[in-house]
Amino acid sequence: MKFSESWLREWVNPAVSREALSHQITMAGLEVDGVDAVAAEFNGVVIGEVVECGLHPDADKLRVTKVSVGSSELIDIVCGAPNCRQGLKVAVAMVGAVLPGDFKIKKAKLRGMPSEGMLCSYSELGIDIDSDGIIELPLDAPLGTDLREYLKLDDAVIEVDLTANRADCLGMVGLAREVGVLNRQAVTEPQWQAVTPTTDAKVTINVKESAACPRYLGRVVKNVNVKAATPLWMQEKLRRSGIRSIDPIVDITNFVLVEFGQPMHAFDLAKLTGDIQVRLGNGEEKITLLDGSEVTIPSDTLVIADDARPLALAGVFGGEYSGVSDTTQDILLECAFFAPLAIMGKSRRLGLHTDSSHRFERGVDPEMQHKVIDRATRLVLDICGGEAGPVVEAKSDADLPKPAQILLRRSKLDKILGHYVPDSDVVEILERLGFSVVKGEGCWQVITATYRFDMAIEEDLIEEVARIYGYNNIPNVAPIASLRMSDHKETDLSLKRVRSLLVARGFQEAVTYSFVDPKLQNLVHPGEQAMVLPNPISSEMSAMRLSMFTGLLTAVGYNQSRQQGRVRLFETGLRFVPDINAESGVRQQAMLGCVITGPQNDEHWAMESKTVDFFDLKGDLEAIIGLTVSASEFSFRVATHSALHPGQCAEILRNDRVIGHIGAIHPSLEKPFGLNGKTIVFELELDALLHTSLPLAQAVSKFPANRRDIAVVVDESVSAGDVMKLIRKVGENQLVGINLFDVYLGKGVEPGKKSLAIALTLQDTTRTLEEKEIAETVESVVSALKTEFNASLRD
């Protein structure tokens, strides 16, 4: 909703600045989106009249004029505007004037002819009006008057973002009421002479859907001059409300729309056949609208029709056939109340959204129609002339909405606000809002206003009291509450620690949708059944995720397409696996997923550029596992997964139970997800990760540690993890450290075999180990490896 400050102040003029007024409106819940000047800064521009206008002797497109600005001397001005002509009232920038952009007007010669000023267009003065040529002012504009003063250009356009419940403020009358209430000032509505019918011309109105249209008014106005000029004051008020001037009849209906928030429509009376009918479409009728588009009218859509055809979509859009044109002489003014539910959604279904439907969907005042049709008729008579007939009304009192009756309790008011507002203030606020208030014992019986469709329950009234009383006048009081420490098992690893570790290792947390593209998910989990949403946001978001892979891979592709070469993401969330044995038929599991791609490190002169591989992400996962005291319970095992590379995939196990997978993305998935380069992922069950054991404090041994390196040759199929696990088991008493520092295949090692170089660190907490003891431990390790894996020491 746009409106000019000056127009608002015609209704109510509080003694506050523009900034304070905007702040008041915002704090009242009508958020001010912007305040813009109606014109750029300029000075020295006055109203003049072109007394003489002739062609320039040396330029076909220039005109030499003599202009009067009310003084005894005429001013010579050379002008290039095509609409410059004798007798025209114009905007004259005098010598010394400063126009927008710090453009100063000086005496000059154009093609040899003197020019002592400039005839201005709207754009040259920073006024947003589409117009060819110079400004054309009304013939009664007073010569010599400052243009800023005449057009009231020291004004601002205020744009308010209204919520759907405040339809009463979709007109100047509602905004003025709000400002008046906030400043304890009375609202001065415009005054006009009531219209007395001067002709008996009228139409018969037949409302067949009274629940959808409880009130319909029609009035004939004969012999109107549709070619009359819309007054400049009306054009300016419409422009500052974001509406361009079209013709006087349309301008008048738009003007009362902005003034009172009540949509109207005008029909060409000569195009009507028989009675006016308000009925539903039959599902087969078509209508060409005022914008030239043709629509088929659904059977549940309300229309205005005559005996021959539909004339308009009720409350939405007028029809082209019956619209006012240059040849119109007699018009029928329509002013109606349409029930919000009768209009709601109809315009959007047809791809339309109009100022009328916007208001009717939210609700207009059902008691406003008589006043508005009289206001519009008076404006038509004053601007276009003509003779007005009587107002014809079709009304269903039973279907007209009634003001809500709401009981407001003092106890409920105090409880919700947490602050005592005196009884006198409560009554004053509600009455200033136009409500009727009757005091009871510890309560008030309130009858709301007809224009407040959003008043239905007690909390609505409490909000109004708080809003007008002022949120800033309600002190901040800390709630009284008993604090209790939350339960936390020491055997549980907190998710916060896991998140912090991943962030410290260069990851960023992603939050993806729980519903994913079923086509992409089928590539990741072929043949697995997923939950399908009955009403998805879109077809690409219609399946619940079976793992974190789909969302994370989509996020990687999104980032890579935006020049992000190095991507490291993690996400925690639920996966949804159909399970007939689970509650509601779905098993929800909390999961942790990570993905990396691109270089290991950000580009740096002292670092070699190297692409991430399987072991980079495995190292990150082992760092997470290291947060638990139960790291020895975790292991990895070569496996296969439909989404992972068959040669670079492993299961993640805890106590020999599979809790997740890690590996490189299968090459067949790179193109569908838009992946560029090797991508490594893992996913595991959070519950299996976060449960740990209490740490046991141990003294640090003061005796020296001893390192022994062994190189064992095993089959290529033997997992290094299994080898390390066996060594740890055999040497658990004295072996304090195991490190695989080399894997070798090639010369000196038989085909099908590999060499594992392992560092063994031995230490005792009570004494220094002797060489014999160390040798025995190493020998027991080698012997166990030989027995289990047919391993041999490499020479």
From Swiss-Prot:
Mg(2+) binds at residues 454, 460, 463-464. Its main location: cytoplasm. Binds 2 magnesium ions per tetramer. SMART domains: B3_4, B5, FDX-ACB. Pfam families: B3_4 (PF03483), B5 (PF03484), FDX-ACB (PF03147), tRNA_bind (PF01588), tRNA_synthFbeta (PF17759). Its cofactor is Mg(2+). This is Phenylalanine--tRNA ligase beta subunit. It comes from Shewanella oneidensis (strain ATCC 700550 / JCM 31522 / CIP 106686 / LMG 19005 / NCIMB 14063 / MR-1). The gene is pheT.
